Amino acid sequence: MVMAGASSLDEIRQAQRADGPAGILAIGTANPENHVLQAEYPDYYFRITNSEHMTDLKEKFKRMCDKSTIRKRHMHLTEEFLKENPHMCAYMAPSLDTRQDIVVVEVPKLGKEAAVKAIKEWGQPKSKITHVVFCTTSGVDMPGADYQLTKLLGLRPSVKRLMMYQQGCFAGGTVLRIAKDLAENNRGARVLVVCSEITAVTFRGPSDTHLDSLVGQALFSDGAAALIVGSDPDTSVGEKPIFEMVSAAQTILPDSDGAIDGHLREVGLTFHLLKDVPGLISKNIVKSLDEAFKPLGISDWNSLFWIAHPGGPAILDQVEIKLGLKEEKMRATRHVLSEYGNMSSACVLFILDEMRRKSAKDGVATTGEGLEWGVLFGFGPGLTVETVVLHSVPL
């Protein structure tokens, strides 16, 4: 009896699991209509925050914006709104209620825009969605943005939800890792992944004693991205993976305590950055790559397609130097940084979308710039690094 029971349990467990790897079946992105040009932003920022008397600081901020390699950024906050809410423009004025009132509504709404596009590309009824993974660093509420999205989209009430708050910039990798595990361990699962970020929680005026906060004001922007993730695509209804996920890992870098911190206060979400973040990442990236690609026998990092969270150009520059990467390796990453800025968790998903679109446009052999294997890196508070090994598909 024991053997029969064990056998049937094994059979049940086997039947519950997918046969193949998790794949990204569709991608959708969305941004607020309002956008700012980086070249004009220092003048706008110091004017709207009533800080034009801080001329030296404004010059520093101009240099930060120039070095950012960003051309434009999308932002929900408009000049009209900020004029009506001057407490959000001061550096340390109590303003959390106003910020929360914005993000608890706008974060799921922007997420819905991206999700609708992903579901449309997927081409299947939304009733087939079994799981929702929602990620944001913009505000906290109960019930959460996952619940609000479920209602906005009209998903089944029995959909299984996971809400991730306050993870930061590495979380685009985290959601892929979680979606991979859900898809591969639940036969027939279709996971809707949404990352939605709005800088209304972090926007504030300048301070000449907190330059790390000013760095964030030069980089951060708003955007949402959504994916449908599932294993064993049903080709009879047109499902086809864009990328497959082979492995996923997370690690805390040594000697990196306090390198990136964020704290929710009465004044909103405050960020603190150390100057040596690019150095800490580049110093440890070889170890992450070795661990991820040793099973595949790959050690030529130029043979991979690259998707790296664009925390800023200095991080990308130092990673390129450390690994001897060719300039074109970070093309998709730098393009997204230039056209959208740092959208925190949503960035790497935007880069996936950019890469598959450019690959199709250029007529190369695969979704990964013509290459078979790729890597996706998320970097963020901790310092935490997410490493996802990707397999492209033929075009």
Curated annotation (Swiss-Prot):
The gene coding this protein: CHS
Organism of provenance: Arabidopsis thaliana
Record carries keyword Chaperone: no
Keywords, ordered alphabetically: Acetylation, Acyltransferase, Flavonoid biosynthesis, Transferase
Family listed: Belongs to the thiolase-like superfamily. Chalcone/stilbene synthases family.
Catalytic activity: (E)-4-coumaroyl-CoA + 3 malonyl-CoA + 3 H(+) = 2',4,4',6'-tetrahydroxychalcone + 3 CO2 + 4 CoA
Protein EC: 2.3.1.74
One Gene Ontology term of the molecular function aspect: naringenin-chalcone synthase activity
Record-level GO BP terms: auxin polar transport; flavonoid biosynthetic process; regulation of anthocyanin biosynthetic process; response to auxin; response to gravity; response to jasmonic acid; response to oxidative stress; response to UV-B
Record function comment: The primary product of this enzyme is 4,2',4',6'-tetrahydroxychalcone (also termed naringenin-chalcone or chalcone) which can under specific conditions spontaneously isomerize into naringenin.
Protein name (database record): Chalcone synthase
Source organism, top-level taxon: Eukaryota
One GO CC term on file: endoplasmic reticulum
Pathway(s) where this gene product acts: Secondary metabolite biosynthesis; flavonoid biosynthesis
Catalytic residue positions: 169
